């Protein structure tokens, strides 16, 4: 017995599966889903039950479709109808319209009669219900068509108000107008010939702009859909007074036309926006060209990109200009000075090379600041700096004591000034800064420094003693510094004083008194009693007014160290004379080779001050080391810069000091012994084993030449390291190595400090060289030069060849003719020659730093990974 499934029954009755399943379950059938099967009796009973219900599936489904159509506001797309029915309009114009319509009606009537025959088999209740539904749908369709036509006409009139008035069209009108009117005629014909159609209409596939025949699904008991008229390939022709008839457009055509019309409008809007944006993009934004600078300030080594930024031009333009000038370059290639100047001439501007200032050269910076201060417009009057100079015990400190109203000379050792003292004296609301210099012959450098930083020199000469050697020296210092001299003839109150004799003596040195027709001021004073001291001060102020001494207090402070010392409680202390600008507490400073920040600042009376103006002597603390007298003081913007400059200057000074120190070597041993009257020759001895070290030490200590013997200050086993070099440098000794090598760090340190390292592998050769050097008969003919160092990274053992070492050149180079040493843990394992040198599979003459190579050593195969290979050459040197 054949069985049917639930979904087959639902398909025949055009009812949803869930309704059939529900009904079958109500009838008591064992049904779980639409895939459950029923026999013929169950099917017959189920069908009768479904047909007897008041609700018909097709009616229910059609009501959904009609309600969906009621909600949609359809606008007929004139363009879609025009394209689809263009050929039908052509037939109408040629008289074939009637014949085609008659055939179409006959086909439609035949289909309808066939459908009626099929539906007669249904029961009367279903037929009546279906007829009611058809009538209702036809009425709804007619009403919807009328609304659509009215809205279409209204829209057409709004868009083309003039075209809607035209009824007769000539053959010369445009195809677009023909298609618009043809659409209206097609719609009228469809409305006239259309019969009621069934509710079940399957929409065609949403292919745009394609006039395909709509697909119709035949569903019982629904009437077939009216097919679209066939199109012909003949070219349409039109009569002059021909007016098309309107036809009604089917629902499916309206829906499809509406969709295509909406899509076209969306595309048009989108394309319009895209075109507008493209038009905006097509308009190139013109870059405002910046003018060329008047002067090109360049640095040698700049490339096209750097020059483009300075010239306000693109790098490509710079490269093009250089190409036209015959210079092939790219944007990143460095250019030399001549090329940059040539480019500047091409642009018609001047070129000026930027000079880099070495900020560690504070002497140059000091001079520059002094020149800028003199050219400044914000200059103010400053106190004169006066240096008191003269022979020892002529009364310089006594005069200063009188000026300061203190007893200074009693505190000096032996009555002689031991250091420069700086003091300020107030006279008639004006300040004068005095510097007291030593008068002893041993302090000539201090007198010279005092003359360099002063404005006026007061030369003190004792009336009872006359001109002395230090007096003449003071005159020379003052003249070399270009400083005016005021002569103070002191001790006129003493018996035997003869001021005129002093004036006569000074005339020999170019100091002619004003009273005798010269230009040198002479004042006869007594520092002890204070006679004419006031007149001396007035002369100082008068000379200062003539000189117009000025300074800029707003710029960075610069000064000079008068004296410096190390204080137990305060650290480094420096006496500073501020020459330009204002020095403040907290300023980062560099003084000579030292640096720091001003922590405490005190004046000449011992009081703390926060700032020091020009021509003010102060005492400062906060330096990392003690500077030297006459060192320059410069203030920097920040402490970081001051620290870097100070450290760099200290490093440069140390290197310079090492260059000047001459260490003892075997080459200069004999000369050093004679020059310094040496009694011992200090040697640092290093050997590979303790036995060799002891034997060498005993042999060397037996050597004695002309009362000079060898002193082994240190003996050890192993490679020569940094501590050995440091010890030899501090002891003015040289290093002897027996079968050992120095480390790379120790070798670099020895080269920088000038420590001599001699390496041997024969014990009697050590004895001969040291003894010959002490006798002055050392004649070296060859000198070993290390050319490179290698590290063994891998080894391979090959029969008939031996061990091949894969090595990396750490520094220098190795050649095929080089001597080679195998060093393991600082001990020389073998000293021989290179047997072969290869790079990959090719024999090479040389391998430089940073490359790998394969190397074999003559008569030696005990090479291990991490062994150090030292390549060297023997060079002949002249006898020293």
Curated annotation (Swiss-Prot):
Domain tr-type G: 381-550
Leader sequence segment: none
Residues covered by region (G3): 436-439
Region (G4): 490-493
InterPro entries: EF-G-like_DII (IPR053905), IF2_II (IPR044145), IF2_N (IPR006847), P-loop_NTPase (IPR027417), Small_GTP-bd (IPR005225), T_Tr_GTP-bd_dom (IPR000795), TF_IF2_bacterial-like (IPR000178), TIF_IF2 (IPR015760)
Composition skew (Basic residues), residue ranges: 262-275
Name of the protein in its database record: Translation initiation factor IF-2
Organism (species): Lactobacillus johnsonii (strain CNCM I-12250 / La1 / NCC 533)
Gene assigned in the entry: infB
């Amino acid at each position: 017995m054949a069985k049917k499934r639930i979904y087959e029954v639902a398909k025949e009755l055009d009812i949803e599966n869930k309704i059939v399943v529900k009904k079958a379950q109500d009838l008591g059938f064992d049904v779980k889903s639409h895939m459950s099967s029923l026999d013929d009796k169950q099917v017959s009973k189920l069908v009768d039950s479904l047909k007897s219900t008041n609700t018909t599936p097709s009616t229910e489904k059609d009501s959904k479709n009609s309600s969906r159509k009621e909600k949609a506001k359809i606008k007929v797309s004139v363009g879609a109808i025009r394209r689809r029915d263009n050929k039908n309009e052509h037939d109408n114009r040629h008289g074939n319209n009637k014949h085609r319509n008659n055939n179409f009606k006959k086909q439609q009537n035949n289909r309808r009669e066939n459908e009626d025959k099929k539906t007669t088999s249904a029961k009367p209740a279903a037929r009546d219900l279906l007829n009611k539904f058809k009538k209702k749908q036809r009425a709804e369709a007619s009403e919807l068509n009328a609304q659509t036509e009215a809205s279409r006409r209204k829209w057409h009139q709004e868009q083309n108000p003039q075209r809607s008035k035209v009824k007769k069209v000539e053959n010369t009108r445009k195809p677009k107008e023909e298609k618009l009117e043809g659409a209206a005629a097609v719609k009228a014909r469809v409305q006239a010939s259309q019969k009621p159609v069934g509710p079940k209409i399957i929409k065609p596939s949403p292919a745009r702009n394609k006039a395909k025949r709509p697909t119709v699904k035949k569903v019982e008991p629904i009437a077939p859909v009216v097919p679209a008229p066939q199109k012909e390939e003949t070219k349409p022709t039109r009569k002059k007074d021909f007016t098309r008839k309107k036809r009604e457009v089917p629902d499916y055509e309206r829906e499809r036309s509406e969709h295509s019309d909406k899509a076209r409008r969306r595309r048009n809007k989108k394309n319009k926006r895209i075109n507008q944006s493209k038009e905006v993009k097509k308009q190139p934004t013109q870059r405002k060209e910046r003018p060329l600078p008047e002067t090109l300030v360049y640095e040698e080594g700049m490339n096209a990109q750097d020059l483009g930024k300075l010239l306000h031009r693109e790098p490509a333009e710079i490269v093009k200009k250089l190409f036209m000038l015959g210079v092939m370059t790219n944007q990143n290639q460095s250019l030399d000075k001549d090329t940059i100047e040539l480019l500047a001439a091409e642009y018609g501007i001047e070129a000026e090379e930027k000079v880099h200032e070495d900020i560690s050269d504070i002497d140059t910076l000091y001079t520059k600041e002094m020149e800028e201060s003199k050219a400044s417009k914000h200059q103010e009057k400053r106190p004169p700096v006066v240096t008191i100079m003269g022979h020892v015990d002529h009364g310089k400190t006594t005069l200063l004591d009188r000026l300061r109203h203190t007893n200074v000379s009693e505190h000096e050792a032996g009555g002689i000034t031991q250091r420069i003292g700086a003091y300020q004296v107030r006279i008639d609301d004006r300040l004068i800064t005095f510097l007291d210099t030593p008068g002893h012959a041993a302090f000539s450098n201090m007198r010279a420094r005092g003359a360099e930083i002063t404005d006026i020199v007061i030369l003190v000469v004792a009336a009872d003693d006359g001109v002395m050697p230090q007096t003449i020296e003071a005159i020379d210092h003052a003249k070399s510094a270009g400083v005016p001299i005021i002569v103070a003839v002191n001790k006129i109150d003493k018996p035997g004083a003869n001021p005129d004799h002093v004036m006569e003596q000074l005339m020999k040195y170019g100091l002619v008194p004003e009273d005798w027709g010269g230009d040198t001021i002479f004042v006869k004073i007594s520092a002890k009693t204070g006679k004419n001291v006031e007149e001396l001060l007035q002369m100082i102020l008068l000379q200062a007014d003539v000189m117009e001494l000025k300074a800029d207090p707003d710029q960075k402070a610069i000064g000079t160290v008068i004296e410096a010392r190390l204080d137990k409680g305060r650290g480094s202390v420096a006496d500073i004379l501020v020459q330009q600008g204002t020095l403040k507490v907290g300023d980062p400073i560099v003084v000579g080779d030292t640096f720091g920040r001003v922590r405490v600042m005190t004046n000449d009376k011992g009081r703390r001050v926060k700032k020091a103006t020009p021509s003010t002597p102060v005492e400062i603390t906060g330096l990392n080391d003690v500077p030297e007298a006459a060192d320059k003081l410069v203030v920097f913007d920040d402490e970081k810069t001051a620290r870097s400059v100070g450290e760099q200057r200290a490093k440069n000074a140390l290197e310079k000091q090492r260059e000047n120190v001459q260490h003892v070597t075997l080459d200069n041993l004999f000369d050093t012994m004679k020059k310094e009257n040496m009694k011992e020759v200090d040697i640092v001895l290093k050997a590979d084993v303790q036995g060799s070290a002891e034997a060498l030490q005993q042999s060397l200590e037996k050597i004695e030449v002309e009362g000079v013997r060898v002193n082994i200050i240190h003996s050890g086993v192993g490679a020569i390291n940094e501590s050995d070099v440091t010890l030899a440098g501090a002891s003015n000794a040289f290093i002897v190595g027996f079968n050992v090598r120095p480390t790379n760090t120790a070798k670099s340190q020895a080269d920088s400090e000038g420590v001599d390292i001699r390496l041997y592998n024969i014990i009697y050769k050590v004895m001969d060289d040291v003894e010959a050097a002490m006798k002055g008969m050392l004649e070296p003919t060859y000198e070993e030069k290390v050319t490179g160092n290698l590290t063994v990274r891998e080894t391979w053992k090959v029969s008939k060849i031996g061990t091949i070492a894969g090595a990396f050149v750490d520094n220098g180079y190795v050649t095929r003719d080089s001597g080679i040493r195998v060093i393991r843990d600082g001990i020389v394992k073998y000293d021989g020659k290179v047997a072969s040198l290869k790079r990959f599979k090719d024999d090479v003459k040389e391998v430089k730093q940073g490359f790998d190579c394969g190397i074999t050593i003559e008569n030696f195969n005990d090479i291990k990974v991490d062994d150090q290979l030292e390549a060297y050459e023997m060079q002949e040197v002249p006898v020293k």
